[in-house]
């Protein structure tokens, strides 16, 4: 997958409704679907499209958050953050630097911190090299296609 994320520059758009369409839509789509002009997409192209769909859903949520507050950078952690390609796409689409923590079990760490009573002396996690936004017009075009297709199928996202 990491190599595919570097090599594939024009994957199809994937409407990711696996398990239901999450925030900010919170509704069902009929079926997850790849939007492409042909049925010749490779497994690699479909895998990259799935990763991009995650980035697109994150971006949609970021845009809604930024209606209420300013965000200057993103910090990511956990399993999927191990994918450099995902982090770079998120930086390029959001226009913000992305910093990744060296913590593949961020959810478990967060639960442990809460269970410990939120101690102020909790050990910090080291940051790994980050990702700066780079111009990626095709990615932004696929994002627009993704949003337009979701709005056509589901309507506007739920109100803030």
Predicted region positions:
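Glycine/Thr-rich phosphate-binding loops that ligate phosphate moieties of nucleotide
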Residues: 1-160
